[in-house]
């Protein structure tokens, strides 16, 4: 997938599946893994998404991981921010390692690299703590956090699709008013 996969935007998926917005898509994805209470789940949306993916050869993402098609973009962010190395960590901080950014730029899947945490890379941290990429264990989003200085020259919008969080944005943002995707 990392070498031969083709990116498809969430915006495109929403249009094709007839979802109102990315919040509805998130609800369908999280319903597919049994990650929502029954009052929040949407099995009809889950089924529409599953059908669309099957018909169009789309591999839906797995929860709680940096997707293969995002991995090079994540490495690029740290490289463009001026870092030659970064800290990679597992979910709980039990296994953190300082690795060269070039290791993450390889065409190999991070899950199969012996130099990286045994139970998967869930966090990427700049050595000076000015930039962090984190994936929530039971969700389908990647959060990229940074200082104003760290983000100043980064063109995150050109690498990823998403929205800018505010101080009020919660981990379970699908229950909040929908934040528009950045154009």
What are these regions (language model features)?
Residues 1-2, 8, 15-18, 23, ...:
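Low-complexity, charged, repeat-rich alpha-helical/coil interaction segments
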Residues 1-112:
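Extended, low-hydrophobicity segments enriched in charged/polar residues
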Residues 133-183:
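Alpha-helical oligomerization segments
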Residues 88-150:
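Amphipathic protein-protein interaction modules
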Residues 64, 68, 109, 113, ...:
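Alpha-helical context
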């Amino acid at each position: 997938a990392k070498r031969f996969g083709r990116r498809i935007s969430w915006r495109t998926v929403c249009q094709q599946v007839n979802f109102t917005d990315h919040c509805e898509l998130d609800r369908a994805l999280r319903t597919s893994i049994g990650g929502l209470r029954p009052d929040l789940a949407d099995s009809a949306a889950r089924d529409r998404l599953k059908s669309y993916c099957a018909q169009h050869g789309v591999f839906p993402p797995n929860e709680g991981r940096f997707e293969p098609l995002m991995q090079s973009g994540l490495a690029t962010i740290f490289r463009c921010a001026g870092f030659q190395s970064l800290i990679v960590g597992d979910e709980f901080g039990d296994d953190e390692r300082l690795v060269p950014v070039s290791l993450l730029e390889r065409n190999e899947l991070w899950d199969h690299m012996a130099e990286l945490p045994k139970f998967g890379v869930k966090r990427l941290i700049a050595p000076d703590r000015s930039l962090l990429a984190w994936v929530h264990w039971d969700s389908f989003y990647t959060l990229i956090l940074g200082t104003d200085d760290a983000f100043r020259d980064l063109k995150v919008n050109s690498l990823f699709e998403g929205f800018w969080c505010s101080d009020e944005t919660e981990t379970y943002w699908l229950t909040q008013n929908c934040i528009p995707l950045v154009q």
